[in-house]
Amino acid sequence: MNKKVKKIFQSNEPYIFLIIILLGIVVQIRSGQFFTANNIVDLLSAMIVPGLFAIAEFMALIAGGIDVSFPALASLSAYATTKFLLDKNYEGNVLLAFVIAIAIGAVLGAFNGYFIGYLNLNAMIVTLGSASIFQGIMQGTLRANQLSVIPPGMKSFGTAAFLTATNKANGLTSILPYTFIILV
């Protein structure tokens, strides 16, 4: 084996990848339902939110820091936006929701950036503290609870099918929403 291949197999990642592939093959052999278009669409759909979070964290890592506040920041931005639009009985398209959520996220990100960039505080400590602050704002100030209704524009955007797959064996239909395009 050459040096590159030896170096690759000195880390854990190739073995984890092989285990995942083997598990997929075993499940496919046992059920016949793993490598179906329906399941692949479901897997892609399930990757949207974690994928967006991973991209956001990757940007922080590239910049030389670490951000542990991004789940709380995203939750606060999404909840505050949705609650605001519901309170205003907004029934327009999703573009306004994106603009508001991005603005809230930018302000909260600037809050972190001030302490990290200008005051030279440790990124891990700042974002850990700001995550607690953001969660406190959601639970204390906004009295966050589960929203059973969302504005129509947000709902239609989240449920509009970019791709549909139907499993002929069991009749299940899966949709890949347009939000997948944002991830890609």
Name what the model sees in each region:
Residues E13-L18, L43, A72-L76, L95-A103, ...:
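Hydrophobic alpha-helical transmembrane segments
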